[in-house]
A protein has these predicted regions:
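Short, low-complexity patches enriched in S/T/P/G
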Residues: 1-9
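Acidic, metal/ion-coordinating pockets
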Residues: 8-254
Length: 254
């Protein structure tokens, strides 16, 4: 009887040890192990414009990026400023230097499978709101993500987000409304409420968007501005102020 009690006690102890070991294994197997994040490459261009004398080149159906495609095509993400309307409209609303291209050329701007086109610039609305809508449709049809302009403020303020090798990259696009003041808001409209337009820089909006992106797990936030004086090689005080503001709000690159 005594032997049975000892045997029973040993069985209970062994069972407890097995449970403890199992619990330890369970805890170990279910602990959060952070997956290492890989590198992510982003190529950023300046103005990409298919207007003026570009039609003769584009009609050859060759990539305008062919001499740099080893750079633009090999990156994980390509960010461009698409600086013209893509429309067949002949009704320019801007009297000087209106820029447009035929919508059929838009796919040539996709020099990378992951291409983002920034539209907050001073030529998107050269052919009015209809020209802007034609441009958005052409970019959608070409599979190019677009930011910085839209049919309303919510659409214009949308950001682009990509998950690359375990890293989340968010891109935000603004234009400085202090530039090009010679044009009325009818010619160069700022998106406001339900009204179409470009995404104008607003300090409070930028702070909210950047901090929201970070709070939602974005590893890298890029703010892509269209600002500064044309043909100038140095930043003006407004540019410096805005750049420092968004960096203070948490932007990683400007």
């Amino acid at each position: 009887m005594k032997l049975k009690k000892i045997t029973l006690i040993l069985i209970i102890i062994l069972a407890v040890l097995v449970l403890i070991a199992g619990a330890a294994t369970f805890t170990s197997n279910n602990s959060i192990i952070e997956t290492p994040k890989g590198n992510a490459s982003v190529v950023v261009t300046g103005d990409v414009m298919f207007a003026r004398n570009m039609a003769g080149v584009l009609s050859l159906d060759e990539s305008p990026f062919r001499h740099v495609e080893n750079v633009t095509g090999s990156a994980d993400l390509l960010l461009i400023n698409f600086e013209n309307a893509a429309t067949t409209s002949g009704c320019a609303v801007k009297g000087d230097v209106p820029l447009k291209c035929d919508p059929s050329y838009v796919p040539l701007a996709k020099a990378n499978n992951n291409t983002v086109a920034a539209l907050a610039n001073n030529h998107l609305f050269d052919y009015g709101t209809d020209g802007m809508k034609d441009t958005l449709k052409s970019l959608d049809d070409a599979g190019i993500t677009h930011i910085g302009a839209g049919n309303n403020e919510s659409q214009a303020r949308q950001t682009a987000s990509s998950d690359i090798n375990g890293r989340n990259i968010t891109i935000i696009n603004y234009m400085d409304s202090n530039n090009f003041k010679e044009y009325s808001t009818d010619v160069m409209p700022q998106a406001n409420g339900s009204n179409p337009g470009y995404s104008a820089y607003d300090s409070d909006v930028a702070k909210c968007q950047i901090q929201d992106a970070k709070a939602n797990g974005s590893d890298v936030v890029i703010v892509y501005f269209h600002f500064g004086n044309e043909y100038s090689h140095s930043p003006n005080p407004d540019q410096e102020k805005m750049a420092h503001e968004v960096i203070d709000y948490g932007a990683d690159a400007v």
